[in-house]
Amino acid sequence: MEKERQDGLSDKHKFILQYIMCRTAGVDNEQVRELVQEQYGETATVEDVINELNNSLHNFDFKIKRVQDQLDGRLTLHFQNLSGDPVSQMATPYPPVQIELMRKIIEWIMKCDDYQYSLTTLQIQKLSRKEMGLAPSVIESHLHTFERDGWLRQREGIWTFTNHALAELDAYLHNEYESNLYECNACREIVIAGYVCDCGYCLHVYCCKHLAHVNCINCNTPWANATVIGRW
């Protein structure tokens, strides 16, 4: 039996923890499963190891959070800092203007119209120029930095949060933008890609497919008539 240190973590636990921590944009659950089985044997599970890690990390306000992709259901693991201001913490390598821009982008995404939870490059440039006086070339450079570091993702010029950003910002978004949020009634996570019925029942795209419900289980309205959340 491997000896545990004073913090309650064995060397194998610490190895897996470091593996997850070093991948700041998150790590695929399947990769961690393979690593766990290499270290502990084929009967070991990711769930058990992560639970053991979280029991120790809890005392230091850290957590490993499992996130399910809202479109395809792929599971990733993310290291979370649960204390302080998550926006400042996630942006510590950045100068103040980038931290402020990130705060603004979070606000604009959360408050955008028509359930879109996303912004075009042009929208970000216009808002940034109006509220912060930043030139388009500067904004574009900052956006690609946020994309490179795993906080924002873009497809065809449309920007939204990554799974890692949603994991890191979960408490912050609930505290600051509770009235602008939708939560999936299946998995209880924030929805930026999904459907909301007129009755208020809400599902991620993946959760809706996985459950295979043709109609809303709350009011029996066809999901085909639901409002789409996000641009995907």
Curated annotation (Swiss-Prot):
<comment type="similarity">
    <text>Belongs to the NSE1 family.</text>
</comment>
<dbReference type="InterPro" id="IPR011513">
    <property type="entry name" value="Nse1"/>
</dbReference>
<keyword id="KW-0469">Meiosis</keyword>
<feature type="zinc finger region" description="RING-type; atypical">
    <location>
        <begin position="181"/>
        <end position="222"/>
    </location>
</feature>
<keyword id="KW-0479">Metal-binding</keyword>
<keyword id="KW-0833">Ubl conjugation pathway</keyword>
<keyword id="KW-0862">Zinc</keyword>
<dbReference type="GO" id="GO:0004842">
    <property type="term" value="F:ubiquitin-protein transferase activity"/>
</dbReference>
<keyword id="KW-0863">Zinc-finger</keyword>
<comment type="subunit">
    <text>Two subcomplexes smc5-smc6-nse2 and nse1-nse3-nse4 exist. These subcomplexes are then brought together via a number of interactions, forming the Smc5-Smc6 complex.</text>
</comment>
<dbReference type="GO" id="GO:0000724">
    <property type="term" value="P:double-strand break repair via homologous recombination"/>
</dbReference>
<keyword id="KW-0808">Transferase</keyword>
<dbReference type="GO" id="GO:0008270">
    <property type="term" value="F:zinc ion binding"/>
</dbReference>
<dbReference type="GO" id="GO:0030915">
    <property type="term" value="C:Smc5-Smc6 complex"/>
</dbReference>
<dbReference type="Pfam" id="PF07574">
    <property type="entry name" value="SMC_Nse1"/>
</dbReference>
<dbReference type="GO" id="GO:0006281">
    <property type="term" value="P:DNA repair"/>
</dbReference>
<protein>
    <recommendedName>
        <fullName>Non-structural maintenance of chromosomes element 1</fullName>
        <ecNumber>2.3.2.27</ecNumber>
    </recommendedName>
</protein>
<dbReference type="GO" id="GO:0061630">
    <property type="term" value="F:ubiquitin protein ligase activity"/>
</dbReference>
<keyword id="KW-0234">DNA repair</keyword>
<keyword id="KW-0233">DNA recombination</keyword>
<dbReference type="InterPro" id="IPR036388">
    <property type="entry name" value="WH-like_DNA-bd_sf"/>
</dbReference>
<dbReference type="GO" id="GO:0005634">
    <property type="term" value="C:nucleus"/>
</dbReference>
<dbReference type="GO" id="GO:0007127">
    <property type="term" value="P:meiosis I"/>
</dbReference>
<keyword id="KW-0539">Nucleus</keyword>
<comment type="function">
    <text>Acts in a DNA repair pathway for removal of UV-induced DNA damage that is distinct from classical nucleotide excision repair and in repair of ionizing radiation damage. Functions in homologous recombination repair of DNA double strand breaks and in recovery of stalled replication forks. Plays a critical role in meiosis.</text>
</comment>
<dbReference type="InterPro" id="IPR014857">
    <property type="entry name" value="Nse1_RING_C4HC3-type"/>
</dbReference>
<keyword id="KW-0227">DNA damage</keyword>
